[in-house]
Design a protein with these regions (language model features):
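Pocket-lining segment of extracytoplasmic ligand-binding domains
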Residues: 92-94, 102-104, 132, 168-260, ...
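Short, low-complexity disordered leader/linker segments with a strong preference
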Residues: 1-34
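An extracytoplasmic/periplasmic, membrane-proximal ligand-sensing/linker region
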Residues: 177, 181, 188, 198-216, ...
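N-terminal (or domain-start) structured segment
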Residues: 27-97, 106
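Bilobed "Venus flytrap"/periplasmic-binding protein-like clamshell domains
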Residues: 32-60, 64-65, 122-188, 302, ...
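A structural signal for short loop-to-beta-strand junctions that line the ligand-binding cleft
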Residues: 106-119, 124, 243-252
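Short helix-loop capping/hinge motifs at secondary-structure junctions, enriched
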Residues: 130-137, 266-269, 322
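Hydrophobic/proline-rich hinge and linker segments of small-molecule sensing/allosteric domains
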Residues: 18, 114-135, 261-262
Length: 323
């Protein structure tokens, strides 16, 4: 069931009417009276990050931001298409699938959304129970492994990474659980490992590691390079040591980008102001959530295959990040 939480419900009409940022709204766009933000499960980074920046955006602009807990990237794109939310957090690879109508969106091409900004790196985290004899991803063959919600972007990431290690869909016992449910299942011995694609550290994994010994599995250079050659939306990144209890060393993995998208029906002024507010208030967002430290204009516009919303494009051109 989708959870909805209103953040500070009062709408200050003078502030909304006085939104900063020039430019005319695009055809069919209307002035936003609220922004409904689709995030992810309430133990994931999308929900925590979205709640943090949503509060700050509302405080600075006066427009209500309504945080929705959802099934994450695929569901969020569908929610924008259906007009049920105005903005959403999604993986940049899932955006690409939707816009081209491939893989996760095979036969279901969706182009009714636009990019606002890439925000931070999402790490493909493979969390395992070392007592089950698992020290590498190759050891997942024959194990009970949760690969995220069925049909989710996480499941596609898991399939791609496992295939890179020669593990096919029938070579392990597949479980489709959310991050929180996966952590509970590993704690209870019902699964041996799970995939979690989110900004690290992730709440579900942090909570699990408090009372359960877990190992974060590495994606070594040889396997990472081979996977990147096939799926160029990935890049390599090390998860810092001590992100989770009992894991003192840096662990290399693959990452994609958590990206903010918007409905083209939202006017350019609103999205301009949203984008500007995000980057003008990086310090406050970082104080509220550690991933805010990754807000950077050059990063925000790179590796993106879906056109930018006119409001976001205006902002990035003003600061020289886009030409």
């Amino acid at each position: 069931m989708k959870k909805t939480a209103m953040i500070a419900a009062l709408l200050l009409v003078p502030l909304v009417m006085g939104f900063a940022g020039g430019g005319k709204a695009g055809e069919g766009a209307k002035k936003a009276e609220r922004l409904r933000l689709a995030t992810g499960g309430n133990t994931g980074t999308y929900y925590a990050y979205g709640s943090a920046f949503g509060q700050i955006v509302q405080n600075k602009t006066g427009i209500p931001v309504i945080i929705q807990s959802t099934g994450a990237s695929k569901a969020n794109i569908q929610l924008i298409q259906a007009g049920e939310v105005e903005i959403a957090l999604v993986q940049n690879d899932v955006m690409d699938y939707a816009y081209r109508g491939v893989d996760l969106f095979n036969g279901e091409k969706i182009t009714d959304f636009q990019t606002v900004a890439a925000l931070y790196a999402e790490a493909c985290q493979v969390v395992a129970d070392p007592s089950k004899g698992i020290t590498t991803i190759a050891d997942l063959k024959g194990k009970n492994v949760s690969v995220g919600d069925a049909g989710s972007g996480v499941e596609f990431n898991a399939n791609q990474i496992l295939a890179g290690y020669g593990i096919g869909p029938n070579d392990f016992n597949r479980q489709n659980l959310s991050f929180g449910a996966s952590a509970d299942a590993l704690r209870d011995g019902k699964i041996d490992a799970f995939f979690c694609v989110a900004g690290a550290p992730t709440t579900a994994v942090m909570d699990l590691a408090i009372n359960k010994t877990v190992t974060l599995l590495e994606i070594d250079n040889a396997h990472a390079d081979a996977i990147i050659a096939q799926y160029p939306f990935y890049t390599k990144l090390a998860i810092p040591g001590n992100s989770y209890r009992g894991n003192p060393n840096d662990v290399q993995t693959l990452v994609i980008k958590a990206t903010l998208i918007a409905s083209p029906k939202v006017d350019a002024d609103t999205i301009y102001t949203l984008t500007k507010t995000l980057f003008d208030n990086k310090a406050e967002i970082t104080a509220a959530h550690v991933k805010g430290a990754e807000l950077e204009a050059g990063y925000a516009v790179s590796g993106i295959s879906v056109p930018f919303h006119p409001g976001a494009e205006k902002y990035f051109k003003e600061i020289g990040a886009l030409k």
